[in-house]
């Protein structure tokens, strides 16, 4: 049986401030540092080990992975960083407070922007300082690959080539894999693995810093999935994510 571990980064400073983060490269909060170290300790306690790791090019995910691997004494394993694992791009909402945005536009509209499958937030202008085309880490991307906004469908579309071309073949070869990424890039993968409908994906919330284990068959189809850790605390964390976009 194959086990794949998914981990949303620990709480970031902008998670703490309830701001839309997207591709903005903000670091972990003190709580996020603690969450990510605890995730590493929990994975080690539960007997997990890894041969290879994947993460995004954003430091909140990279830092989370470092803390996990340090706690597991696995800092020597190969780590692949790829922009396709970035959080979805929140367009012109990036940096804005979620509750204040809900007060301005209404809870229902913000829920659509945050959680719907195919409705992106308002786009950035390309002359906006927040436009990722100005960032050297994306210099090798084709112009059409650099987003000005994204919905979850866009995130799925840009993530799946990485899954199909790199991650899935590595899992099939017998490598034990951990993916440390973001709420929406992981929602994209969970939607794909579990074949969740466009309507039902709205209700899926992934908490920060809690390992999500997928047990897969040889065709990489899920047999079951579960979070590690205290289930009561887990539900509180999921509810907290769900309530972030409310006025």
Curated annotation (Swiss-Prot):
Residues bound to substrate: 8-15, 21-22, 60, 87-90, 98, 114-115, 183-184
UniProt EC number: 5.4.2.11
Gene3D superfamilies: Phosphoglycerate mutase-like (3.40.50.1240)
Gene Ontology MF terms: phosphoglycerate mutase activity
Any single biological process term in GO: gluconeogenesis
Domain of life: Bacteria
Catalytic machinery residues: 9, 87
InterPro entries associated with the record: His_Pase_superF_clade-1, His_PPase_superfam, PG/BPGM_mutase_AS, Phosphogly_mut1
Pfam families: His_Phos_1
Involved pathway(s): Carbohydrate degradation; glycolysis; pyruvate from D-glyceraldehyde 3-phosphate: step 3/5
Keywords, sorted A to Z: Gluconeogenesis, Glycolysis, Isomerase
Catalytic activity: (2R)-2-phosphoglycerate = (2R)-3-phosphoglycerate
UniProt site positions, description: Transition state stabilizer: 182
Keyword Cell inner membrane among record annotations: no
Family per similarity comment: Belongs to the phosphoglycerate mutase family. BPG-dependent PGAM subfamily.
Function of the protein: Catalyzes the interconversion of 2-phosphoglycerate and 3-phosphoglycerate.
UniProt-recorded name of the protein: 2,3-bisphosphoglycerate-dependent phosphoglycerate mutase
UniProt organism field: Chlorobium phaeobacteroides (strain BS1)
């Amino acid at each position: 049986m194959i086990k794949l571990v998914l981990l949303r980064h620990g709480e970031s400073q902008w998670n703490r401030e309830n701001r839309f983060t997207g591709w903005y490269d903000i670091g972990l909060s003190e709580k996020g540092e603690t969450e990510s170290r605890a995730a590493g300790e929990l994975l080690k306690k539960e007997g997990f080990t890894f041969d290879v790791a994947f993460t995004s090019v954003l430091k909140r995910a990279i830092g989370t992975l470092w803390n996990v691997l340090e706690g597991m004494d696995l800092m020597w394993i190969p780590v692949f960083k790829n922009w396709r694992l970035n959080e979805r791009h929140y367009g012109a909402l990036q940096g804005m407070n979620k509750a204040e945005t809900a007060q301005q536009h209404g809870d229902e509209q913000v829920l659509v922007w945050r959680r719907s499958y195919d409705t992106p937030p308002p786009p950035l202008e390309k002359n906006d300082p927040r436009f990722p085309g100005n960032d050297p880490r994306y210099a090798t991307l084709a112009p059409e690959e650099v987003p000005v906004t994204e919905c979850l469908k866009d995130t799925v579309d840009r993530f799946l080539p990485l899954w199909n071309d790199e991650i899935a073949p590595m899992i099939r070869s017998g490598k034990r894999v951990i993916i440390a990424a973001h709420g929406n890039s992981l929602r994209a993968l969970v939607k794909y693995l579990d074949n969740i409908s466009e309507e039902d994906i709205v209700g899926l919330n992934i908490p920060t810093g809690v390992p999500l284990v997928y047990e897969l068959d040889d065709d990489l189809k899920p047999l079951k999935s579960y979070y590690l850790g205290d289930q009561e605390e887990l539900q509180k964390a999921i509810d907290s994510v769900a309530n972030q976009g409310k006025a």
